[in-house]
C-alpha cells in the first residue's frame, strides 16, 4: 500500500519519538503537519516543555540552535540545514566589545534572530513579542540592541527613559515592505486596519494601526471586529490567519513579503530529515552554556 507523505510523517513521529516545531513563516502544508506552530518566543518556550526526545525544527538555523541551547539532552534536527537568516549574522563580536568599553553600564540586548556566538556575548535575549517587557525590566540606562535596527528603534520609542545604541542589521523581507506599497493597499482597502511587524521601517510603522509580533498580529486579527486587514509581515502568516478566521479577508502589500529561506522547507525535506535523523544541530558545550544564560534570562523576565 502506498502511503502519503503526511501519513509517513505521522508514522515517523511515533516510531522515532519526534515532535515537529514550525514557525509561522514556513509554507502552510508544513505548518499543517507540525505539532506546534508559533513565533520565535513561543517556539523557544515550548522547546523546553516537550516530552519527546527528538525535536524536528521547521524554521531557520538560529531557531534550531536556540532549541539545542535550551535542551542539551535532546536531539535537535533541522528540516533544512541551509535555511538561514541573513540578519542573524549582521553584528560581530568586535562591535559588542567596543560598545561595552564605551558604555560600562550597557546591557547587550540580543534579538533571538542571531547566532549562538552572538548570544554568548549578550546579556539577555528578546523576541519581538517580549522585547518591550524585557527592556523595561532591565536596570541598565544604556541598551545596545542587536542585530535588528528597526526593532531596536521601535522599542526605543516606547522606553524613552533609556538610551539606545543601535546596530545596522535588518530583515530583508520586512525592509522590502515600503510605505508607498502600504498606502496603495490602504486606497484599495480603506476599511482594513494595517497590522505590521516591528521589523518594518519607521515610515511604515507610522501609518500602521497595530504593531506587533506574528503571534500578536494573529491575536489582534482574530479578536478584532474588522472583517478585512492589510498584513505587513512575511506571507507564511496568512495560512494561520485564514485557518483561525475563515470569515475574514487578509491582503498583502506586494510580492516581496516572502522569505526564501523559510520557504526552503518542504514536506519532502521533513520526511528525509526524520528518516535519516539529520542534519543534527551540534554545538560546543562551552558555547552552549554561555548562549544559554541570556535565553534563560529572557524566559524568566518575559513571564
Predicted segments, located by residue:
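Active-site loop-to-helix "anion-binding N-cap" substructures in soluble metabolic enzymes
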Residues: 1-231, 237-303
Amino acid at each position: 500500500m502506498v502511503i502519503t507523505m503526511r501519513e509517513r510523517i505521522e508514522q515517523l513521529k511515533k516510531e522515532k519519538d519526534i515532535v515537529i516545531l514550525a514557525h509561522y513563516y514556513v509554507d502552510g502544508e508544513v505548518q499543517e503537519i507540525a505539532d506546534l506552530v508559533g513565533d520565535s518566543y513561543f517556539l523557544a518556550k515550548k522547546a523546553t516543555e516537550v516530552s519527546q526526545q527528538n525535536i524536528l525544527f521547521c524554521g531557520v538555523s538560529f531557531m534550531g540552535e536556540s532549541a539545542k541551547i535550551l535542551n542539551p539532552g535532546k536531539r535537535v534536527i533541522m528540516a533544512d540545514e541551509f535555511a538561514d537568516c541573513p540578519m542573524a549574522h549582521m553584528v560581530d563580536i568586535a562591535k559588542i566589545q567596543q560598545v561595552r568599553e564605551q558604555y560600562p553600564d550597557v546591557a547587550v540586548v540580543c534579538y533571538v534572530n542571531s547566532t549562538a556566538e552572538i548570544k554568548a556575548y549578550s546579556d539577555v535575549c528578546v523576541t519581538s513579542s517580549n522585547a518591550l517587557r524585557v527592556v523595561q525590566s532591565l536596570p541598565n540606562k544604556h541598551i545596545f540592541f542587536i542585530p535588528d535596527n528597526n526593532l531596536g528603534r521601535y522599542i526605543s520609542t516606547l522606553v524613552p527613559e533609556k538610551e539606545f545604541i543601535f546596530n545596522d542589521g535588518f530583515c530583508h523581507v520586512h525592509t522590502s515592505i515600503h510605505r508607498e506599497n502600504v498606502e496603495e493597499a490602504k486606497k484599495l482597502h480603506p476599511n482594513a486596519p494595517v497590522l505590521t511587524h516591528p521589523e518594518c521601517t519607521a515610515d511604515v510603522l507610522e501609518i500602521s494601526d497595530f504593531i506587533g509580533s506574528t503571534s500578536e498580529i494573529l491575536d489582534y486579527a482574530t479578536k478584532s471586529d474588522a472583517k478585512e486587514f492589510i498584513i505587513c509581515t512575511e506571507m507564511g502568516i496568512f495560512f494561520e490567519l485564514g485557518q483561525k478566521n475563515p470569515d475574514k479577508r487578509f491582503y498583502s502589500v506586494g510580492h516581496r513579503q516572502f522569505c526564501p529561506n523559510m520557504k526552503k522547507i518542504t514536506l519532502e525535506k521533513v520526511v528525509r530529515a526524520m528518516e535519516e535523523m539529520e542534519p543534527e544541530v551540534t554545538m560546543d558545550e562551552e558555547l552552549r552554556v554561555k548562549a544559554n544564560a541570556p535565553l534563560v534570562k529572557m524566559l524568566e523576565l518575559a513571564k
